C-alpha cells in the first residue's frame, strides 16, 4: 500500500504483529492475527472485506473484538454481501441484516449495489441471480 501510494514508511514487529507506519502522516497498517491486536481506542472503523471473510462461527468474537478497539461513539462504516447461500457459500460469506443488527444495533443501512459484474467467478458459476453489496453507517451502541 505505502509503496504503491509513494508514502515513505517504516516497519516494526513485536513477533506477533507487524506495523507499517507512514513517516509523515498519522497512518498505520497492522498485519497479523486480528484477535491478538491491541491498541488505544480508535475514532472510526472501516470494514470493507473483513467481516465477510470471517466464518460464521467466529463472527461474534470478531464483532466483540472490533467493538473493544473503538471509542464509545466511534464512526463505523461496514460493507457486507448478500446472496443465496444455499447455492454457493463463501468466503466471502453472506452477512444479512439481522446479523449486522445483532452485532451493531446503531448501524443503519444506507445503500446497496447489485454488483453482478463484481461477483467472484465461483458465485457466477453457481448461477446466482443476485449478489448485493450493502453499505452500513453509524456509531456502534
List each language-model region with its residue ranges.
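Class I (Rossmann-like) S-adenosyl-L-methionine-dependent methyltransferase catalytic domain
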Residues: 1-38, 63-141
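A short acidic, Gly/Pro-enriched loop at the edge of an enzyme's catalytic core
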Residues: 37-45
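Flexible, glycine/proline-enriched loop segments at strand-loop-helix junctions
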Residues: 51-54, 90
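A short, conserved alpha-helix within the catalytic core of class I
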Residues: 53-65
Amino acid at each position: 500500500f505505502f509503496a504503491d501510494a509513494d508514502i515513505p514508511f517504516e516497519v516494526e514487529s513485536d513477533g506477533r504483529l507487524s506495523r507499517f507506519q507512514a513517516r509523515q502522516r498519522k497512518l498505520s497498517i497492522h498485519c497479523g492475527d486480528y484477535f491478538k491486536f491491541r491498541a488505544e481506542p480508535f475514532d472510526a472503523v472501516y470494514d470493507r472485506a473483513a467481516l465477510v471473510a470471517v466464518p460464521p462461527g467466529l463472527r461474534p468474537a470478531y464483532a466483540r473484538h472490533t467493538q473493544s478497539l473503538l471509542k464509545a461513539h466511534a464512526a463505523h462504516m461496514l460493507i457486507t454481501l448478500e446472496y443465496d447461500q444455499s447455492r454457493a457459500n463463501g468466503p466471502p460469506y453472506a452477512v444479512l441484516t439481522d446479523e449486522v443488527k445483532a452485532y451493531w444495533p446503531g448501524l443503519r443501512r444506507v445503500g446497496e449495489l447489485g454488483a453482478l459484474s463484481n461477483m467472484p467467478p465461483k458465485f457466477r458459476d453457481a448461477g446466482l441471480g443476485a449478489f448485493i453489496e450493502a453499505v452500513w453507517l453509524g456509531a456502534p451502541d
